[in-house]
Amino acid sequence: MERLPLSPAVLFLTITLPILYFWILHTSPARHHGKQLPLPPGPPRLPKIGNLHQVPRQIPWKKYKEWSDTYGPIMSVQLANTIAVVFSSWDLIKTHVERRNTIYSSRPSVPFFLHATGGLNASILPYGPEWKLQRAIRSSVLKPSMTIKYRDVQSMETTQLLHELLSTNDFSVCLRRCIASVFLTVAYGERCADHAGLEAIDRLEELNRAIALHAEALFSGAAGILAQLVLPQALVDRLPVRWKKDADILHNRLTADLVARTRAALARPGWNWVKAFAIKEGTGSGEGDGEQGREVGLKRLAYMVGSLYEASMAASQALRVIILAGILYPDATRRMHDELDAVVGKDRLPDFNDAAQLPYTQAFIKEAMRWRSLTPMGSPRATSDEDECRGYHIPRGATVLVNVWAINHDEGVFLDPFTFKPERWIENPDLPQLLYGMGQRACPGRHMGQDSLFLGTARLFWAFDMALPDGAEAIDQERFLDSGTTLAAFLPDFEVRFTPRSEKHREVIENSVVVSSDVSSVTVAT
């Protein structure tokens, strides 16, 4: 009888299972509980694999909330050879995690991400000198005194956004172009002036999406459990696993794209982030750049700027959430319209000078981000040292998750948490805002992001009435509110009809629009 060839998956398991068996016999989750303190409580675990079989890939925050209701606001789960500690209490975050920032500011080691980005993406760097250096350099262009200088760019792009929505309801594409163009202008000195320019953006997003999807698939599959959570990195590097080849391919493509953008930005006239980072690093154009810059090189510079792209594009997803809230809660939208009409009137577009006089508009944004978080489990962290919290031992190297969804729906923090109430933020300005993270790992671009959300929201709701198109399927709130994974929870697609609120509003938009491919007129100078 002819012998059937082994599939790659079978071959992989044939090679790795004996190694795995030997490995798990000689390893177990961290058992050294300093001073004999126990780990935080959690659901019962199976030998070796722990709770891997119980953690759902989709909407895991609800399962963690269910567990925290049973085991308390600090709990733990075992993911094979990894301990994950989950915080579900704002009080614990405020009084413990934020006060011990240096312990809780590292990142879990995920081999696929490290391979796919060459270990150069600052968002996944462990806490240490390299991360601190990159954080300082990025903060130099993202601090409030600098982000104010980007407001002319944001104003121009949101004006074009309004003009585009006069002739199309394809708002998701328009939002992507708007936010992408803001980033490209300040980062590389190159606008995305029309939808044709999105082709280059699509390539970059495709690569980033592929990396994320591969990582998600690894976490949810058997091969991923072996490669990501059980086998040590030294052993992973020696195994003929397919994901490593995929990661190398994605890394090469992503690097080529980012380096090409960086070279072009260095050659353009005017100021941009690439040039600012190059000066800080001493990289420049490669002519007598200084010892540190020579070591860093163009590739590192390319990733330092390029890794900010995905974070910046979160603003387009956030605006989609705000638009959805505007459709589902018409009473709140009418109140925002009334405020905009009273402060701005019909003869001009809202601008940043109106911000202080638009408290309800600002509150609407905050409530939308609480109501439907983009990152319900936050960004995973790791402990750089062991710690003690409420009599429990937290091991060094533990993965740390913050259940943002649970905190945002905690009745002890937000009264009537399942009701959409923007006024809660006016009545209590000190309510926690978790959109941009917290502590030293908070998003460095949060000030720029807040500006984009304010101006985008104020102008969209000043300009348009928004509703579902005639005959469109009603929005299933459960489907839209309960979708996503541990890493991201973007909204499913939905349709919106944009109608100018009056002919006067249409006239102001048409007369205000500025569409120019001449970047020199909007490039930011220091």
Swiss-Prot record:
Keywords: Alkaloid metabolism, Heme, Iron, Membrane, Metal-binding, Monooxygenase, Oxidoreductase, Transmembrane, Transmembrane helix, Virulence
InterPro entries (UniProt xref): Cyt_P450, Cyt_P450_E_grp-I, Cyt_P450_sf, Cytochrome_P450_fung
The keyword Heme belongs to this UniProt entry's keyword annotation: yes
Reaction(s) this enzyme catalyzes, per UniProt: tryprostatin A + reduced [NADPH--hemoprotein reductase] + O2 = fumitremorgin C + oxidized [NADPH--hemoprotein reductase] + 2 H2O + H(+)
Predominant location: membrane
GO biological process, one term: small molecule biosynthetic process
GO molecular function terms noted in the UniProt entry: heme binding; iron ion binding; monooxygenase activity; oxidoreductase activity, acting on paired donors, with incorporation or reduction of molecular oxygen
Location(s), subcellular: Membrane
Annotated disulfide bonds: none
GO cellular component, as recorded: membrane
Residue intervals passing through the bilayer: 4-24
Cofactor: heme
Top-level EC class as recorded in UniProt: oxidoreductase
Domain of life: Eukaryota
Pathway where this protein functions: Mycotoxin biosynthesis
Binding residues for heme: C443
Similarity comment: Belongs to the cytochrome P450 family.
Protein name: Fumitremorgin C synthase
